[in-house]
Amino acid sequence: MNISLRPAIAAPSPLDSFLTRHRIGIWRVVVSVVLIALITGHSQWDDTWISAALLTVGMLGVTMATVGRLWCALYISGRKSTELVTTGPYSMCRHPLYVCNFVGIVGLGAMTESITLAAILALAFALMYPAVIRSEDHLLSRNFPEFDDYARRTPAFFPRLSLFRSESTYLVHVGSFQRNLADSVWFLGMTIVVNAVELARHAKWLPTFVLLP
């Protein structure tokens, strides 16, 4: 599956539109399934080097995702519907927020110390978000005439570091940024949930019905 897509000038397919409209609901279902598995299961890698590696990767992923989303919010807050943002993180790829989401989602999966749960979250993202990217590219191309040129030189998903550029000063819409702040740090909240489940398991408050690979 190639997430780095060409500019989506054509109208999105019915499936693309469905996934875009219902992505929050779909994610709630996926996350709920993962949480149920985490509550009722236990990592088979517990107290091994694999567990330590997964936890380290998870913490790095969540930290990078949180910082990255805050960086994106500085540039996009208050501008999303009024102008095409092409500097800062948006100079390296067209959808840096989704890049951060992917890194954070995989990080959260790794923090469960289960390769299976991390893979489920990564697969759900890979199946859903190419459609979301196509739909958003189509909308941006309709709203901003300069988008087509921007899309030709800027990858959709995988950042190209050599393209980075930014102004020496940048006006931040503080009110919009503050409203986006909660969305940018929700990974930290989910980290607390995952850690709380692990603490409850070590305290023998939760049953274990299955070992999670």
Swiss-Prot record:
It is a multi-pass membrane protein. Its main location: membrane. InterPro entries: ICMT_MeTrfase. One of its GO terms (biological process) is response to cadmium ion. To A.eutrophus CzcN. Component of the NCC cation-efflux system that confers resistance to nickel, cobalt and cadmium. Appears to be involved in metal specificity but affects only nickel resistance. May be involved in nickel transport. This is Nickel-cobalt-cadmium resistance protein NccN. It comes from Alcaligenes xylosoxydans xylosoxydans (Achromobacter xylosoxidans).
